[in-house]
């Protein structure tokens, strides 16, 4: 999970990509909500914002704009 705009968002489905990168862990590195990890990249596929229904990443991003280079915690 991560926090964004004071909301807790659960990652329900994701794929781990074992690839090298130079980003800080937690950085959003694409418009498709790919997140840099300590090593590798997490490609988010399904999420759920607190008190909301679960959505695939495309549906979620239509209603919530998380900009590239945002650092999630």
Swiss-Prot record:
List the GO molecular function terms: methionyl-tRNA formyltransferase activity
Protein name per its UniProtKB record:
Methionyl-tRNA formyltransferase
| Pfam families cross-referenced by the UniProt entry | Formyl_trans_C (PF02911)
The protein's matches in InterPro entries, at most eight in alphabetical order, are given as:
Formyl_trans_C, Formyl_trans_C_sf, Formyl_transferase-like_C_sf, Met-tRNA-FMT_C
The UniProt family comment states:
Belongs to the Fmt family.
Q: Which UniProt keywords apply?
A: Protein biosynthesis, Transferase
Physiological role: Attaches a formyl group to the free amino group of methionyl-tRNA(fMet). The formyl group appears to play a dual role in the initiator identity of N-formylmethionyl-tRNA by promoting its recognition by IF2 and preventing the misappropriation of this tRNA by the elongation apparatus.
| EC number(s) stated in the UniProt entry for this protein | 2.1.2.9
């Amino acid at each position: 999970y991560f926090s964004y705009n004071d909301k807790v968002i659960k990652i329900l489905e994701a794929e781990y990509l074992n690839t090298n990168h130079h980003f800080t862990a937690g950085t959003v590195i694409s418009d498709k909500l790919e997140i840099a990890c300590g090593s590798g990249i997490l490609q988010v596929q399904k999420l759920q914002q607190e008190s909301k229904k679960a959505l695939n990443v495309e549906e979620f991003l239509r209603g919530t704009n998380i900009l590239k280079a945002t650092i999630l915690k």
